[in-house]
Amino acid sequence: AAELAAAVLWCALTLGTDWLFFRYDWRTPAFFVYKALFLVLAFGLVHGAVTLVQKLRAGDKFARRWVAWTLPYLAVNLVILLIVWPGIWGNDDLAVLYLARTLQPNSWQHFLTSGAFILSLMFVPMPGGVVLVQNLLISGIVGCFAATAQDLAEKRLTRPVRPAWFALVYLPFLLPPVLMHTQQPFRTTWSTWTELNMEFMLVAMYLRGTKLNNK
């Protein structure tokens, strides 16, 4: 109940902060749809944060590893974002951003891109907010990769591996093209990381012997 109340309060606060970026008509159906989606995401974020804190306090090994691997990569991305603030924008990105101010979708760039922009901007109501949210998500994904690799190695290998070796997971994600792509709020960035995360999850489930059904 407390988590839901916090999410509702957060959603209510956005009614006062949206003016920093948006110029929408609250009487349109789009307003209610996006606020409902924001409420769901806010609840998920609050619940996730509470759960993470509980796991860290309980000494959960995977949670601690995830935080330990996420923060260094996030720090690198935030330094780069600070240098290129508010991100690396192209004409297509700006077209989506322009329509997002009035909660309109850019059909040419797919409505999911517009949805990601609008919801990100409700969390952080400035153009750079889209890139900031993107950086947080991507850093969390890379942290999950490293933590999962360490977890799998510990369970599947007979000889222990020093934790420092798992820093090698960072290498492909520290290449300049990848770091620069992370600062570009384009649909290919969102779709690429979504696909990569899904593929990694499937591989991890396979290596863990997780079954999707009883067959």
Predicted features along the sequence, with ranges:
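Transmembrane and membrane-interface helices of multi-pass
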Residues: 72-74, 152, 157-178
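Transmembrane signal-anchor helices characteristic of membrane glycosylation enzymes that use polyprenol
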Residues: 3-19, 34-43, 47, 63-89
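Alpha-helical transmembrane segments of polytopic membrane proteins
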Residues: 27-43, 130-135
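Specific aromatic-rich, kink-prone transmembrane helix
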Residues: 101, 144-147, 190-209
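Hydrophobic core segments of transmembrane alpha-helices in multi-pass, intramembrane catalytic enzymes
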Residues: 38-42, 95-96, 113, 138, ...
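Transmembrane-helix motifs of polytopic, lipid-linked glycan transferases
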Residues: 132-157
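Extracytoplasmic catalytic/substrate-binding loops of multi-pass membrane glycan-assembly enzymes
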Residues: 84-96, 104-119, 124-128
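Aromatic- and kink-enriched transmembrane "portal" helix at the membrane-lumen/periplasm boundary
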Residues: 21-27, 111-114, 127, 131, ...
